[in-house]
């Protein structure tokens, strides 16, 4: 049903008006108000927009354990390890981020105290359009999540290519995509 909500919130030419389409704020608030969903956000590079939607919608204290942004490459390397071949905006970096953050979350949250929590980690590593507008920008985003507290984690990775010619527009698009992914 989450996929249907995402698809139904896209408007195409010729679409008829449809009532009860959840707003971005409503989508984030719905997650924030679910006492069983709890997780972390790690957004490096150009994107810190996804966590912002959750903070702005209200009720985030029950959902968000931690948000972080390691913009500096040396600092990012200290947390997630060095990238040898694939660079910082890569699926390899995304995988390291998701694994590291889920491991921290699971190790810091006592399951006996939180038996009904479904944990998640959202991560992205993104480069937006450059100042000279020669490099359009792209990124990797993903989520590692549980749909049942007693089950193992599922994982989704998405590669994003930006078509906007403005860094702010790219960041906003990333925020919407990330929220819908979660």
Predicted regions and their residues:
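Short, Lys/Arg-enriched N-terminal segments with co-localized hydrophobic residues
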Residues: 1-7
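Non-catalytic propeptide/linker segments at domain boundaries
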Residues: 177-182
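Short alpha-helical segments enriched in small residues
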Residues: 10-173
């Amino acid at each position: 049903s989450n996929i249907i909500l995402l698809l139904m919130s896209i408007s195409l030419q010729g679409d008829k008006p449809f009532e009860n389409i959840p707003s971005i704020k409503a989508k984030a608030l719905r997650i924030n108000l679910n006492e069983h969903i709890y997780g972390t956000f790690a957004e490096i590079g150009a994107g810190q927009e996804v966590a912002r939607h959750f903070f702005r919608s209200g009720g985030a204290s029950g959902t968000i354990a931690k948000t972080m942004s390691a913009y500096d490459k040396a600092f990012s390397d200290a947390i997630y390890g060095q990238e040898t071949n694939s660079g910082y905006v890569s699926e390899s970096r995304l995988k390291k981020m998701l694994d590291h953050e889920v491991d921290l979350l699971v190790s810091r949250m006592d399951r006996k105290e939180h038996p009904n929590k479904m944990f998640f980690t959202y991560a992205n590593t993104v480069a937006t359009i450059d100042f000279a507008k020669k490099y359009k920008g792209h990124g990797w985003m993903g989520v590692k999540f549980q749909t049942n507290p007693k089950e193992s984690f599922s994982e989704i990775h998405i590669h994003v290519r930006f078509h906007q010619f403005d860094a702010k527009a790219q960041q906003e698009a990333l925020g919407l995509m990330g929220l819908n992914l979660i």
